[in-house]
Amino acid sequence: MNLEVIAQLTVLSLIVLSGPLVIILLAANRGNL
């Protein structure tokens, strides 16, 4: 695997993981847990 492919996969995985995390953090800040 090339470094470019690994970099793209890591960026995609971070975006996919950051999606739900941002929603959870926003809900926690609003106290809607």
From Swiss-Prot:
Regions that span the bilayer: 5-25
Designated name of the protein: Photosystem II reaction center protein Psb30
Subcellular location: Plastid, Chloroplast thylakoid membrane
Membrane topology category: Single-pass membrane protein
The keyword Cell wall biogenesis/degradation appears for this protein: no
Oligomeric form and interacting partners: PSII is composed of 1 copy each of membrane proteins PsbA, PsbB, PsbC, PsbD, PsbE, PsbF, PsbH, PsbI, PsbJ, PsbK, PsbL, PsbM, PsbT, PsbX, PsbY, PsbZ, Psb30/Ycf12, peripheral proteins of the oxygen-evolving complex and a large number of cofactors. It forms dimeric complexes.
Gene Ontology terms describing biological process: photosynthesis
Protein's organism: Chlorokybus atmophyticus (Soil alga)
Family: Belongs to the Psb30/Ycf12 family.
GO cellular component, one term: photosystem II
Function recorded in the entry: A core subunit of photosystem II (PSII), probably helps stabilize the reaction center.
Keywords recorded for this protein, A-Z: Chloroplast, Membrane, Photosynthesis, Photosystem II, Plastid, Thylakoid, Transmembrane, Transmembrane helix
Alphabetical list of Pfam families matching this protein: PSII_Ycf12
